[in-house]
Amino acid sequence: AGGESEIHYAPRPEHLNSFDVTHGGACMTLLDVVMATAARSVNQDMGVVTIEMKTSFMRPAKVTPGGRLTAKGRLMHRTKSMAFTEGTIYDEAGLACAHATGTFKYVNRAPDRATEAGIVHPQISTD
């Protein structure tokens, strides 16, 4: 809420690369989601689509078994139709592993056809 978001992520074995650290693609997906969540936190009636994203990897995103990474997103600026964000992934020691900036376009949300059909979505925890 208020232009900020936080997501905790426990990488599964299939999300690790050959060096046994979280794959860069998994990190980029996490950053995309945490930045989009920050952008949407100021207007949950609108959806967002990614226009541009730049990622810098600073250190391996390694976790101990059962451990998790923490991603934090922040809305830096917005206009009526665009959101400018940043996000950082931290390891268990609180060290920054990856940082991204992203630009998102606000769009009208599509109707949730699954809900209309009575299908229940699993809840995603972002604690």
Predicted regions and their residues:
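Well-ordered beta-strand positions in beta-sheet-rich domains
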Residues: 8, 52, 99-103
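Hydrophobic residues in beta-strands and at strand termini
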Residues: 9-11, 57, 106
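Active-site helix/loop of acyl-thioester processing domains in fatty-acid/polyketide metabolism
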Residues: 25-45
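Hydrophobic beta-strand-centered segment that forms part of the acyl-chain substrate-binding groove
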Residues: 38-70
